[in-house]
Amino acid sequence: MLYTFGGKAPQVDPTAFISASAELIGDVIVGPRCYIGPYAVIRADASRIVLEEEVAVEDGVIIHTGGEDPVVTISRRVTIGHGAIIHARVIGPE
């Protein structure tokens, strides 16, 4: 499910797969060939979240903003494992 928050709606590349039970909220950008698994929650209510190319967000993952990094970025070809919680961080090369 895609939700607009604060006037910003998720942007999803047409080649990405988003499970019907996943929730993307606010300023989320999902790149090419990404996978968002069942019951994942990606909540960009405080700042932007960017999933670069071929990122896999597995079942039950929570990613949200609100910390030191102004933009949460998950770099190309990173897999976030089942049930992980990512709070306001950059994952992968800088």
What residue spans do the PLM features occupy?
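Extreme N-terminal tail/first-helix region
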Residues: M1-P14
